[in-house]
């Protein structure tokens, strides 16, 4: 059933196949950012471009040709704001600029560590006396929660499975590389979604003895906002006093981030989801003991794992990826690129008959 549904979803996506931005593209953008801010990195309005209208930047920005020098405000928080800008006049190389009064140094350091493992690419950091500026990848789909809320009627089961699989696999990779890493705030607002043209090309995800073959359906998840994050080599004084009520600590359970993400995903699906989200909700109910779902139980507080509770019954990554939810990626499915119809050969024009 799941495999057939997965194949039907792939067929529906075939018309949108295109070319996605690659790691080499991000590397090139990063080099241009560093070159641009070399002399006046504290004044992004003088070195970047933005679209010359009032529209919100999205996927169409790559086709925009009317631009002007400056940036566009796209978000604000307690300590600062986020702006959109481009390093090229054609606005094909877009970036985000986070400006705030509090230091962004730790967030930049952790961002650099995690960007190869499903984190948002960070390009540069500037300490500018009364403000701190971080230049990073621009993500056009917004937060995971907003993405689901605004597209609830168009998302298919394959999209939810893609989101779940990408996040869990990247957390698995992060903890293999940096076992001490804790994001500590991985809810649906701190995961961003990049929307691009699907390529339907496949990528292998290896978790122990499990190998998943995952198609590119035009959605890429990105971890962001490392304001409460830590590693054994990067301390974070802002987490002091958050251990009892929020379970946030360098000594929190290794699956702290995984649990918070799955619990948050369940809450978002309950609030905004439709029939397409039911399979994902059932997966979360199946994989996590009931005392890990919700806001407060003897195992969790404020939707998060309690620091001093016994979490030995929480599933490992191997157990999670062994669940039937991932069968469509474990089964041998017909090459997804073959769903793209072949172009019909052009018949040669008949030769004119002699008069």
Predicted regions located by residue number:
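ATP-binding glycine-rich loop module of kinase domains
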Residues: 72, 76-113
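Conserved structural core of kinase catalytic domains
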Residues: 120-157
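Catalytic activation segment of kinase domains across protein kinase-like and atypical kinase folds
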Residues: 188-252
């Amino acid at each position: 059933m799941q495999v057939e549904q997965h194949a039907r979803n792939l067929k529906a996506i075939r018309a949108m196949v295109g070319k996605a931005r690659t790691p080499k593209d991000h590397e090139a953008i990063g080099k241009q950012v560093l070159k641009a801010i070399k002399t006046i990195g504290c004044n992004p309005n003088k070195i970047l471009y933005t679209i010359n209208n009032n529209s919100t930047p999205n996927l169409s920005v790559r086709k925009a040709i009317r631009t002007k020098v400056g940036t566009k405000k796209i978000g604000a928080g307690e300590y600062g704001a986020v702006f959109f800008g481009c390093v090229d006049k054609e606005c094909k190389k877009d970036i985000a600029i986070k400006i705030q009064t509090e230091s962004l140094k730790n967030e930049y350091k952790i961002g650099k560590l995690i960007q190869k493992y499903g984190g948002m690419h960070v390009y540069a950091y500037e300490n500018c006396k009364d403000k701190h500026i971080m230049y990073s990848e621009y993500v056009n789909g917004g937060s995971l929660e907003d993405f689901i809320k605004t597209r609830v009627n168009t998302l298919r089961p394959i999209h939810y499975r893609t989101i779940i699989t990408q996040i869990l696999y990247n957390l698995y990779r992060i903890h293999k590389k940096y076992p001490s890493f804790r994001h500590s705030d991985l809810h649906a607002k701190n995961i961003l979604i990049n929307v691009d043209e699907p390529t339907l090309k496949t990528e292998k995800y290896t978790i122990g003895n499990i190998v998943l073959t995952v198609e590119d359906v035009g959605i890429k998840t990105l971890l962001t906002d490392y304001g409460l994050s830590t590693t054994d080599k990067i301390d974070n004084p802002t987490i002091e006093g958050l251990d009892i009520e929020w379970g946030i600590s360098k000594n929190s359970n290794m699956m702290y981030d995984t649990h918070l993400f799955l619990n948050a995903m369940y809450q978002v699906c309950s609030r905004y989801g439709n029939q397409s989200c039911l399979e994902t909700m059932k997966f979360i109910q199946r994989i996590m003991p009931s005392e890990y779902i919700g806001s407060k139980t003897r195992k969790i507080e404020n939707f998060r794992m309690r620091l001093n509770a016994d979490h030995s019954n929480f599933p490992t990554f191997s157990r999670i990826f062994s669940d039937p939810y991932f069968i469509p990626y474990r089964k041998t499915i017909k090459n997804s690129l073959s769903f793209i119809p072949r172009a019909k050969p052009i018949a040669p024009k008949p030769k004119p008959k002699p008069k």
